[in-house]
Every structure is written in structure tokens, then in C-alpha cells.
Amino acid sequence: MEAELTIVIPAKNEAEMLPRLLKSLCLQDYEGMDATRVIVADAGSTDGTVELALSFRDQLAIEVIPGGLPSVGRNAGAKLATTKYVLFLDADVELPEPTLLRRALWRMRRRNLHLATTNIACREGSFFDDALYAGNNLMQYIGSFLKPFATGMFMLFDRRAFWALGGFNERALFAEDYLLSKGVARTRFRIVRGKVLTTNRRFQKLGHGRMVWMFFKTMMHSWDDGYFLRDQGYWGEAEV
């Protein structure tokens, strides 16, 4: 089967979490998985992330390239892609359902979509963690009728549409995924049934209240692209 998908994963010091994601990719029932290029854009990891990624070479067509902030790493990987579709995943997620990739790609083809995403759930999270991700999923659903909203945890793009939008804004210091997804036409966006699992480390480092406030401000500034180019303190506090 000719490759139609490239997967791009920005990473920095993800030796603990990245293997979960890569193992879940190995378990996907998508028939083109063997031909799918998996690109890890590493931002100078010092914990063995690169070595762990390359240890999957006998199971995945995986390679490591230089990265940076997520937007830089994602664009770097996308520039190497020649396939029709590019899937961006965060390094700390995993795909618990082996059918997710197959179903997402089927939806992209059938509806001629530019972007597809899915729901988010917290792995072993607290009530508040689950509530915040449920709120994210709700806003994502509402956005599907108004202005598309997707996070970098799972963004499946038509590659040409991705570059027509300019790719991820590398000057953006906050919510670069939202800044990009809101440019997608509503009729070319869908939420695929299912979910990815992620951690609660964002909430642990910034606090639930701070994350809610930042999310609220993002929604309030959805028409102001300049807001996303100003330092909101996210990476300075959230970076591990």
C-alpha cells in the first residue's frame, strides 16, 4: 500500500511517556501503518528520548529530526512529509483504541476534510482533571458548528490544506494549535468518535484555575491573532 500518512511528534525529555504512544501506534489496525513515516522532532532531550524512539525502528518507520518549541518541531516534520495526510500528536498521549487511525483517515477521505481531531481523556486523573478535559471536549464540539477548535494532541490534516493555512505559526507563544485550527472551514472539520489519553501534568504545573483562566482568555481573544504572539507565561512555567 502506498503511504498516505506521515505522523509528526514534537518531543523534549519524553523518555517516560513517548514509549506509550509508540506502542499504541504499533497496535493500530490501519493497514497502511507499516508504510507510515513516524517523525519525532526532538528539542534537545537529555533523558534518552532519542534512543528510546529509535528502539522502535523494527516496529515503525521511525526517525528523529531536530525540533524546538512544538510549532517549530511540527513544521519541521511536516516539511519532510510527501503524503496526502499529516497527523500531529503530542508525545504524552496514547491511542487506546486500535481503530482510531483507520476510522479518522476514512472520515478524511469520505468527507474530503481538511482537519479531523478526537476527544481527550486523562489517564488516571482526578475529578477536576476529568472535568477540565470534558469541558475541552464540549468546547471542541460547539466549535465544530461555529469555528473549529482542535489541540495538538491529535490533529489530522490534509497536508495541502495545512500549508495553505501557513502551517503552525512559529512566532506564536501560546495556543498555536488553536490559532491554526480556527482557520479551517467549518464544513471541512470533524471530530472523530473516540479519544486519546493524556496526562494531567499541565494542570499539576500550572494549576487547574490557571489553566481554566488561560483557556477562557484564549476564547475571548479568538479574533485577535496578536494575542497569541505575546508571552502568556505558558512555556516558562509548564516546561519540564
Language model features with spans:
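Short, acidic, metal-binding catalytic loop of nucleotide-sugar glycosyltransferases
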Residues: 24-34
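Short beta-strand/loop segment that forms part of the nucleotide-sugar
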Residues: 34-44, 65-67
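Conserved donor NDP-sugar-binding/catalytic core segment of glycosyltransferases
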Residues: 98-128
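Short aromatic/hydrophobic "clamp" motif used to bind/position activated sugar donors
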Residues: 86
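A recurrent flexible, glycine/aromatic-enriched loop bordering the glycosyltransferase active site
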Residues: 115, 120-127, 138-157
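Glycine-rich, basic loop-to-helix element that forms the pyrophosphate-binding segment
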Residues: 65-81
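Acidic donor-binding loop at a coil-to-helix junction in glycosyltransferase catalytic cores
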Residues: 173-180
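A conserved acidic beta->alpha catalytic loop
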Residues: 42-50, 93-94
